[in-house]
UniProtKB/Swiss-Prot annotation:
Keywords: Repeat, WD repeat. SUPFAM superfamilies: WD40 repeat-like. The gene is WDR89. This is WD repeat-containing protein 89. It comes from Bos taurus. It holds the Pfam family WD40. WD repeats lie at residues 21-65, 68-106, 111-155, 167-207, 213-253, 318-357.
Length: 386
């Protein structure tokens, strides 16, 4: 098998989305998990104008657009059907059917009064949705719903199952369910904490498995490692932390790597690193990669090891401005990227690169980088099993 590092270095642009009437930042990307042999896979893109665009993955044509929803955060396909979800600052998580052109949400998951949702995820079996709120008064909540469709109850609005309120003290910026265990979920916050929960427990205190401290405002979290027993996060000031949950019940340190500012330590061939975008765990090779970029649109891919981060390759000639989102497909080794130049790009290894005209960057103020805060220095806190 070709080394994954060589595959990344071999990525070239296959397709570029056509220009839209209203250029927007592309803030989030996800692909449908269902097999669609006739129509091909679908791609959902969250845009900065409060819309979600559904693209055909092979041609990147816009099939339909769900418009008019300012305050959306994140975009995610269900794992077993073509429903698309996004959380909203209006206190709901919205669900659309990507196959329907009506544009109206088919389901609304309502929060508690004054909830402002800024993060969410759906469990691997599509049974539970969890959303994180901004801090209002003294509360930052993780709110849960039953996402299953009940033939006895066909109402389109769902009330919460309950909420966790004791474990974060500030905006909950990230929520990520375990890729295969629907009971495990990790959350990250501007309070610097990354909390791991087992939601099969009876209450919040028992559900909290461990608390890790990134010492800064969390911008991205993910699962990695064999059986996904590791977690990692990035921070709004470009830090990176990586923890091994296998060591919770041992004397081994839980922290695999802690880099306060990746920009200062990474040795990038031919240039610099301006920011981190997210992480990519390659299950087949059991390798974790960190994805970052430059303000001129170059994408940097870095290999993550306990000894540090090593620059693997740079993807150039695609974007003309900051890259805000990406989605890696393990099945065909393809990469989708979106940025502040309003472009959606499809990259594949060894593809014939085509010549395109770079679009100028649109300068829209980003609120996410105004949330940087520095916190106490305890890198993690173990919870003793009773």
């Amino acid at each position: 098998m070709e080394k994954i590092e060589e595959q990344f270095a071999n990525l070239n642009i296959v397709k570029r989305s056509s220009e839209t009437k209203e250029p927007t930042y592309l803030l989030g990307i996800d692909t449908s998990k269902t097999v669609q042999t006739e129509k091909g896979s679908l791609v959902a893109v969250l845009c900065s104008n409060g819309s979600i665009r559904i693209h055909d993955k092979e041609r990147l044509n816009v099939i339909r657009e769900f418009r008019g929803y300012p305050g959306l955060n994140g975009v995610k396909f269900a794992n077993s059907h073509d429903s698309v979800y996004s959380s909203c600052t209006d206190g709901t998580v919205k669900c659309w059917d990507a196959r329907l052109a009506s544009g109206k949400p088919v389901q609304l998951f309502k929060g508690y009064p004054s909830n402002i949702f800024i993060s969410f995820d759906i469990s691997s079996n599509d049974h539970v949705i969890c959303a994180g709120t901004e801090k209002v008064d003294d509360d930052a909540l993780l709110v849960f719903w039953d996402a299953r469709i009940n033939s006895q109850d066909l109402s389109t609005t769902k009330e919460p199952l309950g909420a966790y309120s004791e474990t974060h003290s500030d905006d909950i910026t990230q929520v990520r369910f375990h890729p295969s265990n629907p009971n495990m979920v990790v959350s990250g916050s501007t309070d610097g904490l990354v909390n791991v929960f087992d939601i099969s427990a009876d209450n919040e205190d028992d559900a909290l498995v461990t608390t890790c401290n990134s010492v800064s405002s969390v911008s991205f979290i993910g699962w990695s490692g064999k059986d996904y027993k590791q977690i990692y996060c990035m921070t709004h000031d470009e830090g990176f932390c990586w923890w091994d949950l296998n060591h919770l019940d041992t004397d081994e340190p839980i922290t695999c790597l802690n880099v306060p500012d990746v920009r200062e330590v990474i040795n990038v061939k031919e240039g610099i690193l301006d920011y981190l975008i997210g992480g990519l765990y390659h299950e087949k090779t059991d390798k974790l990669f960190v994805v970052g970029g430059t303000n001129t649109g170059i994408i940097r891919i870095m290999n993550c090891m306990t000894s540090g981060l090593v620059h693997v390759t740079s993807l150039q000639g695609g974007h003309a401005a900051t890259v805000r989102s990406f989605c890696w497909n393990m099945q065909d080794d393809s990469l989708l990227t979106g940025g502040e130049d309003a472009q959606l790009l499809l990259w594949k290894p060894g593809a014939v690169e085509k010549t395109f005209t770079k679009k100028d960057s649109m300068k829209i103020a980003s609120s996410v980088h105004q949330r940087v805060r520095v916190h106490s220095n305890d890198s993690y806190k173990r919870r003793k099993k009773q």
